[in-house]
Design a protein with these regions (language model features):
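Single-pass transmembrane signal-anchor helices and their membrane-water interface zones
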Residues: 25-39, 55-86
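Disordered, charged N-terminal biogenesis/targeting segments of membrane/secreted proteins
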Residues: 1-49
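N-terminal non-cleavable signal-anchor helices
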Residues: 8, 21, 32, 63-67, ...
């Protein structure tokens, strides 16, 4: 942070302190080059593999479950013999998808379509020149046990870990789900159900949905005796494409009309929600299927509804372009009155709600003709936002309510700067708090916006840490905590109890930066990120930091640990973080990129003053064609057992530890 700017902030802090009560088949040479490139990036992708296990800093594992698949090709899928039988679910309650919900005719730049002609007209506004893309059997089961093995247990009535969420009460899909008695593991083309009720973990069943070579399984949800699997697929379709553009309106280099046959690999991208009856875990039964157009973007589960968000590119190209513009949801064309359109829209953002009591159809849907949006979903509303870089860096935000699964547009607004962190946007009591970074000028600038229920500005704090960027954020009660970074990592605290007058409280500086912040009980805030060279900003290791935030005016660093690893899954994907504040545990996977590349799962315990290493489980990558990275390595718990799951392309390993004996 520049010294002058820091002094200005110190003055603000001093003045405020007087008035405030603290309240995620390559050649070796190519792989090595890719590893080197990734090592120097702030955000990383994936890598890695294998079953070799080394234990450090803890007693041996009490049990190991390895499920390996035999002869298997990456693009080959299960046969029809592997498909579960289809059965109907008993429906005790339904929601009428034709229920009338009053819709606003205008929100910001969006206008509610009155007919399909309004939709076609909006698509036609876009030039043709801007074409873009929218978007085996079990071989062995074996166990390794020792004297530290956990005692057999019945149906779990104790605590178990859940997916680490962005918003409490708003569930998110993941590659593994845990209900305390069973683990549900998504691995390439199948979902495996594992019984973890006693020490001898065992595979109960394996679900292999019907897939084509272009289908992929993405995420899971579990709700009592129902398992929900999200898959995405696309068809390569042959279509006669004829341009009706003229020289005057075509800037692509093609003059006049042309006619050709083209293969569109993304011509029909779709997202499918599969529902399985798992009341008999050993015999899952497919009970319902709901398909909607668009590439999967995100999903959430709140109460009795799953909300699906997809997007797809639209254009006027093709002989039957009008038929392609209107998406299908559960076998029906989207209603004209559910479209919000704007000039020059190039992408359809499609929202659908699915009642868990009737998952073969959508309870409601809405389509935005736009240019693509990211999703933030609070307990009261959905916010779709996108960054724009024309005429300055800014973020457009559209707000929708979703009460009882029914969508209703509320408002749209634009703020300066871009949202750089998932947790920089947060809803509380209908109001929205946003931290943005504007890096269009010579010195980047950060802002904190406080918006009311109609997205009107209530308060604004500007000129935050000029020359730095927002790396991580967390809103706890009436305090906004956030990390900015250039060469050092200040943690800031801002009082937002009065939205009209946000006030800076305190800050504390350290080397490196945190990419993820997590509340860790009373007066503590956990930071997961990287240590860096203060002069070059080059990453030198994974860093774990505990902040004392009991007095937001006088923030302190209680302890930090630097680990000699190149990448941390939790720093890039919050779902990869395991946090148990009751036991003081924090777990995550790392990657190291050397001549021998490997993943490592690490578990630390906070003892009140420092971090103590409990698990360091190393898995070396061996087969390049089955390589997976640290984001496929997860920590979970049920009762007094801790599990390390490593999902690979053709198998997965599951290792358990007895926390009562070993921690």
């Amino acid at each position: 942070m520049q010294e002058q700017n820091l002094e200005e902030w110190k003055e603000k802090i001093d003045r405020s302190a007087e008035q405030i009560t603290v309240p995620d088949t390559l050649t070796p040479g190519a792989v090595q080059q890719m590893l080197e490139e990734r090592k120097n990036r702030t955000s990383a992708g994936r890598k890695e593999h294998r079953h070799y296990r080394r234990f450090a800093g803890i007693a041996a594992a009490v049990a190991v479950l390895v499920i390996a698949v035999g002869t298997y090709g990456w693009n080959k899928y299960g046969t029809d013999d592997a498909q579960p039988k289809k059965a109907a679910l008993s429906v005790t309650e339904t929601v009428d998808s034709t229920q009338d919900t009053e819709k606003k005719e205008q929100i910001g730049a969006f206008t509610l379509a009155k007919s399909y002609q309004d939709v076609y007209a909006a698509v036609q506004k876009k030039s043709n020149s801007q074409k873009e893309l929218a978007e085996g059997t079990v071989d062995d089961l074996f166990f390794v046990e020792d004297t530290g093995s956990a005692e057999a247990k019945k149906e779990s009535s104790g605590t178990h870990s859940d997916t680490n969420l962005q918003v409490n009460g708003v569930d998110e899909g993941d590659i593994v789900k845990n209900d305390g008695n069973y683990l549900y593991v998504l691995n390439d083309d199948r979902v495996t159900i594992v019984d973890i009720r006693d020490k001898n973990m065992r595979k109960l069943s394996e679900i292999r949905p019907e897939l084509t070579e272009n289908d992929i399984l993405l995420q899971l949800y579990v709700d009592n005796d129902r398992l929900y699997v999200i898959k995405q697929g696309w068809e390569t379709q042959q279509e006669e494409i004829q341009s009706d553009s003229t020289e005057a309106d075509n800037d692509s280099g093609f003059i006049g009309c042309y006619k050709d046959i083209a293969y569109e690999p993304d011509g029909n991208v779709s997202t499918v929600l599969l529902t399985y009856d798992i009341s008999e875990r050993a015999n899952p039964v497919l009970s319902a299927t709901m398909k909607m157009d668009g590439a999967y973007q995100s999903s959430r589960k709140v109460g009795n509804f799953i909300y699906l968000f997809t997007d797809r590119w639209v254009s006027r190209d093709g002989k039957n372009w009008k038929a392609q513009v209107i998406p299908e949801i559960a076998g029906k064309k989207a209603d004209a009155g559910c479209f919000y359109v704007q000039k020059n829209g190039t992408t359809e953002v499609i929202m659908a709600s699915v009642n868990l009591k009737e998952t073969s159809k959508a309870a409601d849907h809405m389509v935005l003709l736009d240019s693509g949006r990211q999703v933030y979903m609070g307990t009261d509303a959905i916010y779709l936002y996108q960054m724009e870089y024309e005429r300055g860096e800014k973020t457009k935000i559209a707000k929708f309510s979703y009460k009882n699964g029914m969508f209703s547009a509320i408002a749209e607004t634009t703020v300066k700067g871009a949202i750089r962190d998932t947790f920089a946007i947060s809803e509380s009591g209908g109001e929205l708090r946003i931290l943005t970074t504007d890096s269009q000028n010579s010195l980047s600038e950060n802002r904190l916006y406080l918006l009311d229920a109609d997205l009107k500005k209530e308060g604004l704090l500007e000129n935050i840490a000029k020359g730095e960027e927002i790396y991580a954020a967390r809103y706890l009660g009436n305090i906004a905590y956030f990390i900015t970074y250039h060469n050092t990592d200040p943690l800031f605290a801002v009082d937002i109890s009065d939205p009209a007058h946000p006030k800076p409280l305190g800050n504390v500086k350290m080397t490196g930066y945190s990419d993820y912040l997590h509340p860790f009980g009373d007066g503590l805030l956990l930071g997961i990120g990287y240590e860096t060279n203060a002069k070059t900003s080059e990453k030198t290791g994974v860093k774990l930091t505990m902040f004392d935030i009991s007095d937001p005016i006088n923030l302190r660093i209680l302890d930090s640990v630097t680990i000699n690893e190149d990448f941390c899954s939790a720093a890039e994907n919050y779902k990869c973080a395991f946090v148990d504040t009751g036991r003081g545990l924090v777990g995550f996977a790392t990657e190291t990129w050397t001549k021998t590349n490997y993943n490592r799962y690490m578990l630390f315990q906070w003892d009140g003053t420092s971090f103590v290493k409990k698990i360091s489980l190393k898995k070396i990558q061996q087969k390049m064609d089955t390589w997976t990275g640290a984001e496929q390595m997860r920590g979970l718990s049920s009762g007094d057992c801790f599990y390390v799951l490593h999902v690979e392309r053709d198998d997965f390993s599951l290792i358990s530890y007895a926390m009562k004996n070993d921690f």
